[in-house]
Amino acid sequence: DEGPTVVIGDLHLGYEHALEQDGLYLPRINTGSIRDALNDIMSRYEPERVVLLGDVKHDFRRAGREESNQVRGIIDLISEDAQVVVVRGNHDNYIMAVSHIDIMGYRLEHGHEDSGVRPVIIGHEHPSVRIPGAVGGGMKIQCFVHAEKEGVIVIPPFSPFSSGNDLVMDDDCVMAPALKASDYADARIYGVTDMGLMDLGTLRSLFDVKVRRYNIGLYIQYTDSVHWLL
């Protein structure tokens, strides 16, 4: 039975605690933000299954009490209404997980390794695009990446702390083997905004993008089109 399924990845639970071990202190907002977003998703879409697509936890080491409690709490929250499938990411040492799952004709795997099966949905990459402003500055948008010809879909991280690898400004930053093996410059980019998903064109087209701010709003200007953001 393949009922409605939600796929999220790269939660990196325990992120703040891991940084504290190195003397860096951040507001403890990661788990709370993830819980709020999950509650919204569960009530809006009523999925029968939720796939956690790897890097559920942050620390590579065995989970401590705090990280374990956060992971257990998120899984328990989802389990109240849906089946939970945990796919193993490269951070997910010492937790129960599967290497992949096949759903509706798609291979779902974290993405730090490539099984070679297509079409595939992966995380791991933390994709984003940074669009420079005309007078400096700019903005960074988390995004989905769809390399349709190669059958590769990359989802953005679910953690609010994961700002993402900038595919526009540093095309050498690509980590996921499946994405590296594709012609990702021609992949379609879908930005995640407060208004929903926004088609930003291909990655190749974004190399020439400019952002201009006017008192009537902010828009992304391409060579051949304008997409309103605000």
Spans of model-derived segments:
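Extended recognition/assembly regions associated with phosphoester-bond processing machinery
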Residues: 1-53, 57-230
